Amino acid sequence: MRMRNLLLVLGLCLVTTISYSKRSSAELRRFEHTPTTKGNDGGSVSFLVIGDWGRRGQFNQSLVALQMGVVGENLDIDFVVSTGDNFYDNGLIGEHDVAFEESFTNVYTANSLQKQWYTGKGDAEAQLSPLLRKIDSRWLCLRSFVVNAAELAELFFVDTTPFVEMYFTNTEKHTYDWRGVTSPKVYTANLLKDLETALKESRAKWKIVIGHHAIRSIGHHGDTQELVDKLLPILQANNVDFYMNGHDHCLEHISDPKSPIQFLTSGAGSKAWRGDVKKKNREGLNFFYDGQGFMSVQLTQTESTIVFYDVFGQVLHRWDVSKQLHLAI
């Protein structure tokens, strides 16, 4: 009964923009998002990506939000993606925590940002309650799920926190939410299996996997070895185009030398770490910025454009990729 009520609440809240459909695997819930059709090119999808932001407007969070609103309007975005660590320092203490409104509702006020927010879970948070949608209907945060944007793009959100082994041995700095994770090994094994199944079944032109922790990064935390060992091989084997993450408070673009995967870090939504850069393993590095900012993504059937912006809305880095259009006969 409890699960039925949960799905009912989600279904009622998402009816205007997305709809719930049957799971493609045992654990990954699936949502259908119908983007606005633009032009006569078969449609397109545009969205912004922001991470590590929730500080009640401080540390330039409000300035980043302002520029997100400007870019969002110019691109006529369909939705916003958050890569996690949404409320500092240790997430929300409950559904009625004022930090939700002070760090989200009252900060991202631009008209262009009044769209669906698909939100990944950070490493020290508890904001999964569907009751939060009664406060702000834009909010959707689950551990792991799939968003299908008109079969042009599929976004696979992965809860990466249980992969990080030190979180189970060093709990002094943060309070971790392990509800539903009785055994990390079993949980991550099942999640990887479900993700692999969903990726194999996907017919989307663009496959995008989103997690909080970086696979590749030269920022403060660097590479997440557990993800390099366990998650990356699945992405490489299933033609994933982009892996997007936060965790490191910077903006980054690194190319995978063994596949077409682009590693994109957007974790600069508020407090950034100036000068905190690792000198080792810079293979494939295209761009790094240690200030605040965000990222935009534009997708069509044949083209993708990734743009990084700073706190003033200035373009820092742009990456364009083309794909052939294969027509069914």
Question: Where do the PLM segments sit?
Answer:
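Short acidic, glycine-rich surface-loop motifs adjacent to enzyme active sites
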Residues: S202-G219
